[in-house]
A protein has these predicted regions:
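Extended, charge-biased low-complexity segments
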Residues: 1-78, 96-136
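Long, hydrophobic alpha/beta structural blocks
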Residues: 83-86
Length: 136
């Protein structure tokens, strides 16, 4: 099932619960959530797979980073340049096989979004202190 039918607050919890304990995944999901744009877009939510844990029965959700970038690149997920930058950085944090050219994306970010990215990078490094506390 994709994430389009799940209320945003519930989807937020499921994404964070699924990523819990994996700093880079938590940072990637947290960046998308904190940005406040993507979880309100059906085109993005279709890249989210939702289900339940076979061990605990808890609801879970994961972002298909390749699918999200493919939607972006094929025009199915139109975004402003700053939104594209956030998505590309989050995808790179969430999937180590996805590279990001920081020199190309950072110039598209305003002060607020630079703060979100900085917090995500700190969180991905496994630090629970400093700017990461502003994330989420």
């Amino acid at each position: 099932m994709n994430g389009t039918a799940i209320p945003v607050q519930e989807l937020t919890c499921q994404l964070l619960d699924t990523a819990a304990g994996i700093p880079a995944d938590t940072a990637a999901a947290g960046l998308i959530i904190s940005h406040g744009h993507f979880l309100h877009r059906d085109a993005f939510r279709r890249t989210i797979t939702a289900g339940t844990s076979i061990c605990t029965g808890q609801p879970l959700a994961t972002i298909g980073w390749d699918a999200a970038l493919r939607a972006l690149e094929t025009g199915l997920l139109p975004c402003a340049s700053s939104e594209q930058a956030i998505l590309r950085i989050a995808a790179s944090l969430g999937d180590p096989a996805i590279p990001v050219q920081l020199a190309c994306v950072l110039g598209n970010l305003d002060r607020t979004n630079i703060g979100l990215v900085t917090a995500a990078i700190v969180r991905a490094n496994g630090s629970g202190t400093g700017p990461a506390s502003t994330l989420l």
